[in-house]
Amino acid sequence: NAFKPQILSEAINLELDGLDMEKVYALKNGNQDDELFKYLVITQCNALSAILPGMFQKIEDFTELLFPDNLLRDGSVVEQMVALIPEEDWKDQVQIIGWLYQYYNSEKKDDVFAALKKNVKITKENIPAATQLFTPDWIVRYMVENSLGRVVINNLKYDVWSDEEKTKIEQFKEKWKYYIDDAEQTPEVEAELRAMEHNKYGSGEVEPFIDTTFIDPCMGSGHILVYAFDVFMDIYLAQGWSSRDAAQRIVEKNLYGLDIDDRAAQLAYFSVMMKGRQYDGRFFKRGVQPHVYAIQESNEIRYDEEFGEFLLEEQHRDTLRYLLEVFRDAKEYGSILKVEPRDYLGFLNAWELSAEATLENVMMIGWYTGAKDTVTALAWQAHLLSQTYNVVATNPPYMGASGMSPKLSDFVKMDYPATKSDMSTVCMEQAIGMCSDYMAMINIPVWMFLSSYEKLRKNLIANNTFINMVHPGRGIFGSDFGTTTFVIGKGHISGYQGTYHRLFEKQVEVE
């Protein structure tokens, strides 16, 4: 009652860094398949840590004790993943791990909501399990195509481009099946759109569209980022780039992501890296690392002034103090934290160089060694949170005010008074503040109807433009509370005619 993974039958032919072939032969000759499988998986993970450090950490001896037994038995999790999920579902479908992770958390989620009924608030440790919902593929495509895709199509449509360049619009639309064309606009609106787009990307100073930035501030396992990668690739290939060069630039310059869940962020990192590998067979050898991060806290770092003396410039010492202050209990708040714009990249450079200054001070060496990685993470997440992006697209966490911890409740009341009743609307307000062109989101439609959101609605209409909306009603997340998904343009265009679809008026199926 056992199955035999391919890695076992090919064990003696494997070439892995750190693989002890004598041990392989000994385990194989002794018919110790379980131990051999365990050894090969651990060795493979350690080898992968060199090229995928954000996903695979080196497994130490004590960690090996936690490795589960009996993985080769019929009915084990490994056997079920192989037997129950068709092989074709794994091919070019790296986002499948997001589905698996959501269901991995489902038991914990049930426990959290059972406790909530007893008035036990959701702690920061349980926020990921309680609030994560995997986004259906068609909604991901709708959001990305109508935000990131619209950045390109609107510019080609309204700026001064040759007829040859404008033919790319139809090429993109053939690929982007969920892209919704603009409604017919008045001459006055079209004139305003032309003025907005004129020389935005086609001035000749920068190659069009390649500096477009895209962030998912609640990225989960990276489903939205993975499809944004594909859309960016369509854009680059249309510009004449090779897929190899485009993959590297997309990861380095275009895609960004944040989440409070460490493990989900690892999966997002893995998904983006595997997407790069899909387009470039040598991608792992190029030393490129994506800008996707799990929000970290500063709680464990005790900072005394003398520890900061090796940062020679006062601005960097002040930035260190600020980082430790603003990210205290950061996993309680995640991407809704409002972070000052500072020279965080300059601070990072100074922080990396400061290691030499600690060599003559034993106390400082110990402190710096313990704080180094965390402070680096704090600076990177501060950099991402302090920027604006052409496109922000996300499926935010869902948690009503009644489930919030006292700290989180006080925070949103202070910083987000117009949207404080639910985390999804708080994230909506934050996302609009982060974008310069378009914001795409799926959330619950309470903000569309309840009187408590009247101020938000007035602000949205006065300062932004609704491009389009798809209102599916119930059923997107199973037996749920209803959803709406939409794209908002930054800045108000008076008289703009949006496009709206109600999918709940009759039973429909979206492919």
Language model features: what each stretch is:
Residues 2-46, 228:
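Extended, well-ordered alpha-helical scaffold/bundle regions in very large, multi-domain proteins
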Residues 220, 252-255, 443-444:
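Catalytic palm active-site di-aspartate
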Residues 6-11, 15, 55-250, 264, ...:
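Class I S-adenosyl-L-methionine
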Residues 124-130, 252-255, 410-417:
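Short helix/strand-bridging catalytic loops that position acidic/His residues to coordinate divalent metals
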Residues 208-215, 224-387, 391:
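Class I S-adenosyl-L-methionine-dependent methyltransferase module
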Residues 2-6, 226, 233, 237, ...:
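Signature of N6-adenine DNA methyltransferases within the class I
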Residues 1-2, 99-106, 270-277, 377:
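Short, hydrophobic/amphipathic alpha-helical patches that form generic packing surfaces
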Residues 178-213, 361-393, 409-417, 425:
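Flexible, glycine/threonine-enriched loop-and-boundary segments that flank and lead into catalytic domains
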